[in-house]
Amino acid sequence: IKIFLNKLGLIETKIKNVLIIGGGKITIYLAEALLKSRYNVKIIEKEYDHCVYLSTILPNATIIHGDGSDQNILKEEGIGDTDALICLTGSDEENIIISMYAYKEKVKKIITKVNTPSFASLLETIGVASVISPKEITSSKIIRYVRSSANKHGSNILTLYKLVNNRVEAV
């Protein structure tokens, strides 16, 4: 019964092994948090010098020098055995292609960073990955701050309109 429910996605598998593609600032912050929570973290980064840097600041992570969009490297690094894949390269297209490959390889949890809204909605529509967008996260935080500040000072919002697929708000 457990296997059946798991296949339906009704039982979440515990995530232990996380593979991150790309070694930028978001990766560093995320890897630090994951390592503190005792996850096994492996990072694939293209730039050799950056791999050296990552290995010094993230000594408990496994750092791999290679192209994370190369299917052979992904297979060598055990993409089929990873519990979660997080695509954080600087290229939306590369992140999407890697996510689609991970989906084909049946990775349990796929998280993809995209900056282009139409790409985000495409990935969410086909159900390949959970999508994060730094721009949307930032704007959401700013809006939350402005609203809390306005509420603190007794602001009365009479009407709030959401436009363009909830991406624009007019007061």
Region spans (language model):
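Cytosolic regulatory regions of ion transport systems
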Residues: 1-171
